[in-house]
């Protein structure tokens, strides 16, 4: 009976919630800025690090030059109001290894040399698409969707039915 009491006591002890970071894929429709795709990361790592950030890839300066070819690019973190006015398309839970891989990819894009942004070949959609592939999402870079963030992200949901409603 004493052992049963000890087992019951152990079962009733509070258990810390499993650490987890959630990555969400967002689109921002045409408004005061051009359409954009980006990711958010929120949660807590196994070592207790609180994560609450977002990343997108864009031109350093939005000028007509982006229509002509490659220009300087940058990883950008948007203000909470921008994120709030954007549309979350889907989310995926990450373990610490996946989170570290995403952060390494963000750093890779942050340190791309030279004129790293190209509206047709390396834009925000290419960035979020590469992140999506990294976390196990099937991605097809359809040419007609490479300037349409929302349509591109919705195409990923169609390719990966398990994302629907996430």
Task: Show which residues each predicted segment covers.
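Solvent-exposed, acidic/flexible segments
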Residues: 31-35, 92-102, 117-125
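Glycine-rich catalytic cores of cysteine/serine-nucleophile enzymes that process amide/ester linkages
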Residues: 20-88
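Second-shell loop/turn segments in exported
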Residues: 27-28, 86-95, 110-118
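N-terminal hydrophobic targeting signals that begin at the initiator methionine
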Residues: 1-2
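Activation targets extended, charge/polar-rich intrinsically disordered C-terminal tails
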Residues: 21, 104-166
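Bacterial N-terminal signal peptides
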Residues: 5-14
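Generic secondary-structure boundary/loop-capping signal
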Residues: 79-80, 89, 114, 143
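Sec/Tat signal peptide C-region and signal peptidase I cleavage site
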Residues: 15-19
